[in-house]
Amino acid sequence: MTIFDNYEVWFVIGSQHLYGPETLRQVTQHAEHVVNALNTEAKLPCKLVLKPLGTTPDEITAICRDANYDDRCAGLVVWLHTFSPAKMWINGLTMLNKPLLQFHTQFNAALPWDSIDMDFMNLNQTAHGGREFGFIGARMRQQHAVVTGHWQDKQAHERIGSWMRQAVSKQDTRHLKVCRFGDNMREVAVTDGDKVAAQIKFGFSINTWAVGDLVQVVNSISDGDVNALVDEYESCYTMTPATQIHGEKRQNVLEAARIELGMKRFLEQGGFHAFTTTFEDLHGLKQLPGLAVQRLMQQGYGFAGEGDWKTAALLRIMKVMSTGLQGGTSFMEDYTYHFEKGNDLVLGSHMLEVCPSIAAEEKPILDVQHLGIGGKDDPARLIFNTQTGPAIVASLIDLGDRYRLLVNCIDTVKTPHSLPKLPVANALWKAQPDLPTASEAWILAGGAHHTVFSHALNLNDMRQFAEMHDIEITVIDNDTRLPAFKDALRWNEVYYGFRR
């Protein structure tokens, strides 16, 4: 069972009574066939539910109104099988607050050259019915996605499935609660921001809880539960000698397990699916949560360090979007560089908190080592390298008048040397198009030092996310050239300035 099982997408057919009852009967038959086939063969993440034909303004308005109030409905897929005059859609689309995709398809793939007549033409009018629908969307300035292709085409299936992931993610985001244990790292700018504006724009709420409230729950965890979780650690990870039974750091592992159980209980009781910590607010905790955070991220929670609620929320959103896809998604930070002509590299990591979903090793190492920051006992953590291949790093920043999403396409590579003295998980990558261009563009656009790293999602996924939430996106990839990138930033200032 995944989050997608909690939602469905409504399949709505637009038509009109001009063509007579026989045509509408055939439209209904075609729709039933297409929906059944898509649910059976297209490997869509959500179930499609066919709704009654929309042939009048009142029918269409009722469908849109019902979609708004049905918590299971993640969005609408609309197919204009025949011509459907778009003025009939105005009232419904005006009130619709769920994502909308126009599937520009038709029942037949090939034209029946020898038998085609006007009855066939009247029945299969997607080619211009879809354009009428597109006009009213443009006229109303209503954002919606469009997928063109035959309903049996695998590429069309993939694009609809990708959009469904976005639609479900948007509904989940509207209910997302972000818990901040403590406040921001002191004096840091990019991790701060307008929480009210974020809730208005995205729907997620951000509130702070004292670390003492968490400590109270952590201290209530029984020794039996702690021992059971440590047994799980023993089976899932390669334990260093210091962390094994009778090892000198065994007690630190037990404390890490207690923190994990306490954090999870606190988050579950509060209905939180994203959270932050900061090493400056640890009063009452025996160690900075490292292992606990790593494992909670792997279970789907959003997280970011130093109170960075925007990145924590973005990680949760991207975790939902990527559910069931190959590859992992994690909190990340650009940490340090390797400068070598033609082979510039970025080493990404954090103090402790990198999600094991991106690990190359089947069984990461569980170790306890010293951490000077935070002033607490040595924390437990998982240590691993990262899978290789194409990936992205994404950052969501608050510019005051709007939100900007930055995405850099990267290529993760194998670490060329062992890192015997680096006691944290890490990722090594080549930034596209090259490190000087990527880093300069990122800095000019105001990108944060915290990011969400993902092998599972790609640039197109993040473009869809930005469009669905109506926010700015800046892209750094192999096509990026700094002069054009700077121009785009200037144009965006003008565009979004006019929209205020």
Curated annotation (Swiss-Prot):
Binding site for Mn(2+): 306, 333, 350, 450
Entry's EC annotation: 5.3.1.4
Keyword set, alphabetical order: Arabinose catabolism, Carbohydrate metabolism, Isomerase, Manganese, Metal-binding
Gene Ontology biological process terms from the UniProt entry: L-arabinose catabolic process to xylulose 5-phosphate
Domain of life: Bacteria
SUPFAM superfamilies for this protein: FucI/AraA C-terminal domain-like, FucI/AraA N-terminal and middle domains
Group of enzyme by EC: isomerase
Co-factor requirement: Mn(2+)
Function: Catalyzes the conversion of L-arabinose to L-ribulose.
HAMAP family: Arabinose_Isome
Family from the record: Belongs to the arabinose isomerase family.
PANTHER family: L-ARABINOSE ISOMERASE
Subunit structure: Homohexamer.
Protein name: L-arabinose isomerase
